Regions:
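Small-residue-rich hydrophobic membrane-insertion segments
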Residues: 4-70
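Amphipathic, membrane-inserting segments
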Residues: 64-113
Length: 113
């Protein structure tokens, strides 16, 4: 079931982005598809297709691991790279524009490490 949800997110999010952009073009049919792909990415239609693939891959990874796991892993890498203590990293996390619940969850994971 988890793999199904992961695949669905990998397909659904790019499709949703595509439909939203397509609805803003005011065009229909092939012209709408062409205009949407050209608007989505750098380099015209090919860039748009690549952008949708990257969005799908990102959505798939996020659905597989979850936001908190990705943010926690990123914070641990920042701690190692910048040679920060747990307390310094927790202060840095408090400044991030994320929910209080997610901040507490990430800080707990950092303190456990």
């Amino acid at each position: 079931m988890d793999e199904f949800v992961e695949r669905l997110a990998g397909i659904g999010v790019p499709a949703l982005v595509f439909l939203i952009i397509m609805s803003t073009t005011g065009l229909t049919g092939a012209a709408a598809i062409t205009a949407t792909l050209a608007l989505l990415g750098p380099g015209g239609m090919i860039g748009g297709v690549i952008t949708l693939i990257v969005i799908g891959a990102g959505a798939s990874v996020i659905s597989k691991y979850g936001y908190s796991a990705i943010i926690t892993a990123t914070c641990k890498k920042i701690m190692q790279k910048d040679n920060l203590t747990q307390e310094q990293m927790c202060e840095k996390i408090d400044k991030y524009p994320i929910t209080k619940g997610l901040k507490e969850k990430v800080k707990t994971k950092i303190r456990e490490a």
